[in-house]
Amino acid sequence: MEKTCADEFPLTVDSSEKQGVVCIFGTGDFGKSLGLKMLQCGYSVVFGSRNPQVSSLLPRGAEVLCYSEAASRSDVIVLAVHREHYDFLAELADSLKGRVLIDVSNNQKMNQYPESNAEYLAQLVPGAHVVKAFNTISAWALQSGTLDASRQVFVCGNDSKAKDRVMDIARTLGLTPLDQGSLVAAKEIENYPLQLFPMWRFPFYLSSGLCVFFFVYCAIREVIYPYVTGKTDSTYRLVVSIPNRVFPITALTLLALVYLPGILAAILQLYRGTKYRRFPNWLDHWMLCRKQLGLVALGFAFLHAIYTLVIPIRYYVRWRLRNATITQALTNKDSPFSSSTAWLSDSYLALGILGFFLFLLLGITSLPSVSNMVNWREFRFVQSKLGYLTLVLCTAHTLVYGGKRFLSPSILIWSLPSAYILALIIPCTVLVMKFILIMPCIDKTLTRIRQGWERKSKYAQSTLNGKSDI
């Protein structure tokens, strides 16, 4: 016979491990899962229900009573019902006075109501100590015990003692409570579970746009042009050849765009002469998305590496190699060895391998489990110094790939240069601008600005002895 979820966990604990009584209003999925977890951790659980006689599938060892009776059994009450059903609490206002009322509700969409559910609850039951908590934990995670992905619990409330009690409960359940302040923060906490990759949207849209643009650009040069001029069918290039051009171009462009906002911010600070003015919203959001941009770029670099590995087994490549070998045998002609070509080929491969290795290192150090083990200087060294070195290597990899064809007019098709030349525009611009910013005369002033000096401040004169480096 198959065991139920409640049977899979031992719910019997010693009296010395008893934590107290907790009341849960609501017998839905979340209420039952939270009650089961509390029973496992030694709490006595009393459920409050509008129909206690018909409530079923509750954890073994828990009681089910009506709301008023359940409220009288504990001074900590978890409200596991939706906001639409808060009306019954007005009748229990006297019974709930002085009790800790934990609101775990979420809405269907962000900013659905003018005020947060917790603030509305505090207005509805003014005598209770309302605390917002546990709304970022799913019922499935509580029931299955897989809390690794959602272990943090945001807690906010106006009463510090009530918050401390809720945070103690969270720690007993094996969770990590984070104090977010007063109930004013409840709206932000309620919006948090409703967010869908907010910091990934801009990188996703940008990378998608770049991919589409470069794919169409390469298709015009390598598929449409041969068909228009010579009726040659080159559509097979759409599967491997063109994607293997698009992926590295997109990766290099995104990597450059990771460091471009920092340069723009430095230029803006130099122009303003102060760090105490906010950046434009678009630049601020761009800087916040740099980690996501870098990880997306790393993903495209991985795709480029994988696509490159399958090149030798492609039919087109094997056909060209076999055909060239047969032609060479029939004509009895040998191609002379070119030392310069060998240098370019080996340098191109070496730069690509080193660039990809450092790229991978940047991605690893951006993981929270790794970044938490290093201090700020170490993290900045990897992400900034090694990051720019990665950009230099990847840009050099692309330059050497072009080799002698870089400025050759023969590579123009319908006056369109090769796609890799377009890929070099942003990286080279970033590197040139960075080189200018690290010049001592500019870097010294920028450092002072970031340390609090202001060019137009009345204290700036004495700080720089009446002189500026710019």
Swiss-Prot record:
Essential cofactor(s): FAD; heme b
SUPFAM superfamilies the UniProt entry points to: NAD(P)-binding Rossmann-fold domains
The reaction(s) this protein catalyses: 2 Fe(2+) + NADP(+) + H(+) = 2 Fe(3+) + NADPH; 2 Cu(+) + NADP(+) + H(+) = 2 Cu(2+) + NADPH
UniProt remark on cofactor binding: Can also utilize the flavins FMN and riboflavin.
Residues that hold FAD according to the record: W140, D148, Q269, R290, S366, Q383
Annotated EC: 1.16.1.-
TM segment ranges: 202-224, 236-256, 293-313, 342-362, 381-401, 419-439
Any one GO CC term of the record: membrane
Residues the record lists as binding heme b: H304, H397
pH dependence: Optimum pH is 5-7. At higher pH levels, ferric reductase activity rapidly declines while cupric reductase activity remains high.
Keywords from the named record: Cell membrane, Copper, Endosome, FAD, Flavoprotein, Golgi apparatus, Heme, Ion transport, Iron, Iron transport, Membrane, Metal-binding, Oxidoreductase, Transmembrane, Transmembrane helix, Transport
Main location: membrane
GO molecular function terms noted in the UniProt entry: cupric reductase (NADH) activity; electron transfer activity; FAD binding; ferric-chelate reductase (NADPH) activity; heme binding; metal ion binding
Record's subunit section: Homotrimer. Interacts with PTK2/FAK1; the interaction may regulate PTK2 phosphorylation.
Name recorded for this polypeptide: Metalloreductase STEAP4
Species annotation: Rattus norvegicus (Rat)
Name of the coding gene: Steap4
